A protein has these predicted regions:
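Histidine- and acidic-residue-rich, metal-dependent catalytic cores
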Residues: 4-208
């Protein structure tokens, strides 16, 4: 399908720009898939299967806005200055803008909306202290709340230019501590229940 080709192309562009996060897009997409499958069978959160399939499909586009960030900022190993942090934060709104243009000719409003929301709002926080809009709780589109869990978890358990990888125990503890503040508490609880599958995913990826 045309949509699939576009998404694959976008993901490749982002990965080529930000190789310091090596494999982040593939890993977060796999995490989203695991959580989405959990949600498909959940009684606590009722979401349409077609919607969750769409979220899985658009997950690779969440960091598209990073193509507009200078390499010096994108790959900086140390702490950002205020100006650099502001530039880095701009990737979410920029990604949403680019996706809107790229998918303008694709006849799938649901996919476009989900892709824009995932890119724009995956750094929002449940308590309203995220960016770029400072949305809180259910003001944040659910697809972005799902993406936020995958994005942060992968950042925790992966080595970055500014940190070593955290172990599973520490990473899951940080996610648990963030329920109701950084993360949707219900989605977060279901995410924690996916721990066996998530650990298996990362162990298998490490072995490849």
């Amino acid at each position: 399908m045309v949509q699939d080709s576009i998404i694959t192309g976008i993901a490749s562009v982002v990965e080529s720009r930000d190789n310091s996060t090596g494999g982040h897009i593939n890993r977060t997409s796999a995490v989203v898939k695991i959580l989405a499958k959990k949600l498909m069978n959940s009684q606590e959160v009722v979401l349409e299967r077609d919607f969750l399939d769409t979220v899985i499909k658009v997950a690779p586009m969440h960091d598209l806005g990073k193509v507009a960030i200078d390499d010096v900022v994108l790959r900086k190993p140390g702490k950002f200055t205020e100006e650099e942090y502001a530039k880095m934060k701009s990737h979410s709104a920029e990604g949403a803008r680019v996706i809107q243009k790229v998918l303008a000719e694709v006849d799938d409003e649901d996919m476009t909306r989900a892709a824009v929301n995932v890119a724009h709002f995956h750094h929002e926080r449940w308590d309203g202290r995220g960016y770029p809009e400072g949305l809180k709780e259910e003001q944040i589109p659910v697809e972005a709340r799902i993406m936020a869990l995958a994005d942060v978890f992968d950042a925790l358990v992966s080595k970055r230019c500014y940190k070593e990888a955290f172990g599973f125990d520490r990473a899951f503890s940080i996610i648990e501590e963030g329920l109701g503040t950084q993360f949707d508490p219900v989605l977060g609880k279901l995410f924690l229940e996916c721990r066996p599958e998530l650990e298996r995913l990362y162990i298998e990826m490490e072995e490849k």
